[in-house]
Amino acid sequence: MLMEDGGLDTTSEEYRKLSKAERRKRRRATPKYRNLHATRERIRVESFNMAFSQLRALLPTLPVEKKLSKIEILRFSIAYISFLDNLLQ
């Protein structure tokens, strides 16, 4: 049922007898699908981390190079936004 390139042979009689859920499950088990999924996930995580880095760069902390966790960045951002909002009022 697997083809040489790692894809599924969707023309086989066996494949056509499978339920929709089983077809999806088998398709997701192919090396080709797993590699594509891993690549997409890696890009998503890199984008997520880049967004946190950009947000972190906007926050004033002492020392500047202090490493903050993601939750610390979010909490500090909320506090900083509140502080700036209070300054404007």
UniProtKB/Swiss-Prot annotation:
Q: Disordered: where is this region?
A: 1-32
Single biological process term from Gene Ontology: determination of adult lifespan
| Presence of keyword Nucleus | yes
The superkingdom listed in its UniProt entry is Eukaryota
Q: Where is this region: Basic motif?
A: 32-45
Domain bHLH span(s) in chain numbering: 32-84
Disrupted-gene phenotype: RNAi-mediated knockdown extends mean lifespan and reduces expression of bcat-1 by >50%.
**Region annotation Helix-loop-helix motif: where it falls in the sequence:** 46-84
MF terms (GO), sorted A to Z: DNA-binding transcription factor activity, RNA polymerase II-specific; protein dimerization activity; RNA polymerase II cis-regulatory region sequence-specific DNA binding; RNA polymerase II-specific DNA-binding transcription factor binding
Question: Matching InterPro entries, A to Z?
Answer: bHLH_dom, HLH_DNA-bd_sf, TAL-like
Q: Which UniProt keywords apply?
A: DNA-binding, Nucleus, Transcription, Transcription regulation
Free-text tissue specificity from the UniProt record: Expressed in sensory head neurons of the lateral ganglion.
State any GO CC term.
Answer: nucleus
**Where does the record say this protein resides?**
Nucleus
Disulphide bridges in this chain?
Answer: none
Quote the biased-composition stretches of kind Basic residues, using this chain's numbering.
Answer: 22-32
What is the role of this chain?
Answer: Transcription factor which binds the E box motif 5'-CA[TC][AG]TG-3'. Involved in modulating physiological aging, probably by regulating expression of branched-chain amino acid transferase-1, bcat-1.
The protein's name: Helix-loop-helix protein 15
